[in-house]
Amino acid sequence: MIIVTGGAGFIGSNIVKALNDKGITDILVVDNLKDGTKFVNLVDLNIADYMDKEDFLIQIMSGEELGDIEAIFHEGACSSTTEWDGKYMMDNNYQYSKELLHYCLEREIPFLYASSAATYGGRTSDFIESREYEKPLNVYGYSKFLFDEYVRQILPEANSQIVGFRYFNVYGPREGHKGSMASVAFHLNTQLNNGESPKLFEGSENFKRDFVYVGDVAAVNLWFLESGKSGIFNLGTGRAESFQAVADATLAYHKKSSIEYIPFPDKLKGRYQAFTQADLTNLRNAGYDKPFKTVAEGVTEYMAWLNRDA
């Protein structure tokens, strides 16, 4: 059995889909379905069982055996960069992850988990997986950073696989439940389908991020499980592309050309990553050599998926 925490969420459900595509269906999804809309991410997937994340944690902490576990993909977390309840964030993202990590270490179960490019904070170059480059801007980024630091202490002594992925700007199918945290491509598509003019912040040609397609993210996760490699790795494309490029690809799909530019909100000033670009040196040195989709390629595929029933 393979366990995917956050399996009804964005990246987790895409990992479940990638496993299904390989013929794997003996999957336990762990999540919190208080937001019941997330069920839509699972309706077309095949899983063996579902468990609430709190019930799962109780079983983990009691040391109860869950059966023959091949691996745990730990994608479950509060991923809101605008959430400032630090106690909630640390309980949910840090303590929970530690409990799960130790459960895996004691049983030599491969543990593959979601870290984040938010660990780098507001820097504009050298996104390298090393302490001197890390300075998160928000408590979400801090919770991810601190768990990475915890893993770094344990890695040299670990007898089983531990691998963390610093996800950059992931976009693609199954993110609709994320609301304001969904990608720009998702929001632009929604605006266009509602007959509204698509909106971008002023200066969006200057805001550049490493936008990585979720199908590529899932593929990297599965490759690492098969390879058995451990470590903490950036997971982006290695290319920074502008929000304008995302808009251009979305507009091209919809055969539209006009866009409305809106003022940049004060509440985001100083807390907003204006530039991200993954350094893929470590990922490539680990042996992952497949190409990543460009924004034009990924957004076009995503638009086809979003509008498949239109």
From Swiss-Prot:
It catalyses: ADP-D-glycero-beta-D-manno-heptose = ADP-L-glycero-beta-D-manno-heptose. Its EC number is 5.1.3.20. Pathway: Nucleotide-sugar biosynthesis; ADP-L-glycero-beta-D-manno-heptose biosynthesis; ADP-L-glycero-beta-D-manno-heptose from D-glycero-beta-D-manno-heptose 7-phosphate: step 4/4. The active site is at 140 (proton acceptor), 178 (proton acceptor). It holds the Pfam family Epimerase. Binds 1 NADP(+) per subunit. Its cofactor is NADP(+). InterPro entries: Epimerase_deHydtase, Heptose_epim, NAD(P)-bd_dom_sf. The keyword Isomerase applies. It comes from the Bacteria. GO terms for molecular function: ADP-glyceromanno-heptose 6-epimerase activity; NADP binding. Substrate binds at residues 169, 180, 187, 201-204, 209, 272. Contains a large N-terminal NADP-binding domain, and a smaller C-terminal substrate-binding domain. Belongs to the NAD(P)-dependent epimerase/dehydratase family. HldD subfamily. Catalyzes the interconversion between ADP-D-glycero-beta-D-manno-heptose and ADP-L-glycero-beta-D-manno-heptose via an epimerization at carbon 6 of the heptose. This is ADP-L-glycero-D-manno-heptose-6-epimerase. The lineage of its organism: Bacteria, Pseudomonadati, Pseudomonadota, Gammaproteobacteria, Enterobacterales. The gene is hldD.
